[in-house]
Amino acid sequence: MLCGCVNDPVDRTVTPAVEAECGFAEIQVISFADLSAGKIVGALDSQHLRDFFDVRHLLANDGITLELRSAFIAYMISHNRPMAAVLDRRLKNLAEESARGFVGMTVETVDVAEREKAHTDLVAAVIGDMQQDHRRFLVSVQKGQPTGALALGC
């Protein structure tokens, strides 16, 4: 398991809406790439509705950058479950979990079908669009013989 983050933390200020309500604040936080990579692994593995909600926004607004993909690869190879079990996991039924634990948590209403589509889009973006050198590296790690000079920004 990975202890820490792939990228350095960054300083962030609160949004204007939070500042208006609570006042100014600035804090050191995990990088966007590390946060998003963790959300992606969570969405693929645990399939938490919050992660699908966030991934939906990520894909619509920022996409999968090289920095994010590198962090994702680092998190995948340090994950406690086999990569194949995470990357090829069948989507569980989200309707019951949505009604029980997600409805009312967000200002924006997103139905189950949209979150299921986020899963499909995520698999296409993270796995389908993965560069060949990244694929070869993941396969070599899975075989227990890491090869290549894939720079993960560590």
Per-region residue spans from a language model:
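Structured mid-to-C-terminal alpha-helical surface segments
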Residues: M1-C154
